[in-house]
């Protein structure tokens, strides 16, 4: 059974810049105008990351455009947004992030089958320059392979 996901935004740079050690799903606290803007697909999580503040985890630098029809009741576009996780998950995340070199990045934002906005997070470790070059070579080689197979 495939799970329904209507993807709002993806962070493709994160997959290039980081090794993803673990993926997890979190809910997010939003205002009404933010949800309406997300339904129009006006969001960007390219530079966003998550960090802990004691017993809570917040998503920083996530851009959700202002909703045109909300006029004076609009939201701040880059405000920190609280992520909804169980306390066991938060403790596990904090333990992994405290290890040197690991960070928590947003990989995608989507609506699930119950029309709730979810954020896919990844516990990630940064790639070095030579690792990035290696992944570029791999990607090019796979592209060339598929071209050769199509030509035959």
Swiss-Prot record:
The keyword RNA-binding applies. It is found in: Cytoplasm. GO terms for molecular function: RNA binding. One of its GO terms (cellular component) is cytosol. Transmembrane segments: none annotated. InterPro entries: SmpB, SsrA-bd_prot. The keyword Coiled coil does not apply. Its main location: cytoplasm. Keywords: Cytoplasm, RNA-binding. GO terms for biological process: trans-translation. Disulfide bonds: none annotated. Belongs to the SmpB family. Required for rescue of stalled ribosomes mediated by trans-translation. Binds to transfer-messenger RNA (tmRNA), required for stable association of tmRNA with ribosomes. tmRNA and SmpB together mimic tRNA shape, replacing the anticodon stem-loop with SmpB. tmRNA is encoded by the ssrA gene; the 2 termini fold to resemble tRNA(Ala) and it encodes a 'tag peptide', a short internal open reading frame. During trans-translation Ala-aminoacylated tmRNA acts like a tRNA, entering the A-site of stalled ribosomes, displacing the stalled mRNA. This is SsrA-binding protein. It comes from Rickettsia africae (strain ESF-5).
């Amino acid at each position: 059974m495939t799970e329904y996901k209507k993807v709002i935004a993806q962070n493709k740079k994160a997959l290039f810049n980081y090794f993803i050690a673990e993926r997890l799903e979190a809910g997010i606290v939003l205002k009404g105008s933010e949800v309406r803007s997300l339904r129009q697909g006006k969001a960007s999580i390219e530079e966003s990351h998550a960090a802990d503040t004691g017993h809570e985890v917040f998503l920083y630098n996530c851009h959700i455009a202002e909703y045109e029809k909300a006029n004076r009741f609009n939201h701040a576009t880059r405000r920190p947004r609280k992520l909804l996780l169980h306390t066991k998950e938060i403790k596990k995340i904090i333990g992994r992030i405290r290890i040197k070199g690991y960070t928590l990045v947003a990989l995608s934002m989507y609506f699930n089958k119950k029309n709730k906005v979810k954020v896919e997070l990844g516990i990630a470790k940064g790639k070095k320059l030579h690792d990035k070059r290696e992944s570029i070579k791999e990607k090019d080689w796979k592209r060339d392979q598929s071209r050769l197979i199509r030509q035959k």
